[in-house]
């Protein structure tokens, strides 16, 4: 399950243009997944979207992308069923459900589960996690414990 989760004010979610650029210039997965650039909302669109929300949930799981996206989708649905009809989730990293993405929403095998990655939309995961009180740092060794973050805009 979830290692830790926190409710935060949506103003604590940091969106910056450079984040999306790190996807474009430096990520070998760029353009290969529907939940990554160039198929995802721009930082400007994300900033506009965040103005429509006041509360969000940020959570982390130990390094398991499938678990992250499964929890993300389950929580988003649960918030929706509880009356939070604007609930909208963001994952971390590319979609884990297919070995290779078709990169076509009409042909997607998991269209109900695809959610944009925070990074692809310009969300600075490091600063947002720090704002929520999570300890987060750059990992310098592959043996260090990895946490993946998910975010749900609630209302």
Predicted regions and their residues:
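Catalytic cores of enzyme domains
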Residues: 3-33, 37-155
């Amino acid at each position: 399950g979830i290692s830790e989760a926190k409710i935060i004010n949506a103003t604590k979610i940091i969106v910056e243009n450079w984040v999306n650029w790190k996807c474009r210039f430096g990520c070998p997965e760029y353009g290969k997944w529907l939940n990554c650039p160039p198929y995802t909302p721009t930082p400007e669109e994300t900033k506009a979207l965040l103005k429509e929300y006041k509360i969000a949930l940020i959570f982390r799981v130990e390094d398991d992308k499938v678990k992250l996206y499964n929890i993300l989708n389950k929580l988003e649905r649960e918030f929706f069923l509880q009356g939070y009809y604007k609930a909208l989730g963001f994952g971390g990293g590319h979609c884990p459900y297919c070995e290779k993405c078709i990169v076509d929403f009409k042909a997607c095998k998991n269209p109900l589960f695809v959610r944009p990655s925070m990074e692809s939309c310009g969300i600075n995961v490091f600063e947002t996690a720090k704002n929520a009180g999570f300890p987060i740092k750059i990992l310098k060794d592959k043996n260090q414990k990895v946490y993946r973050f998910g975010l749900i805009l609630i209302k």
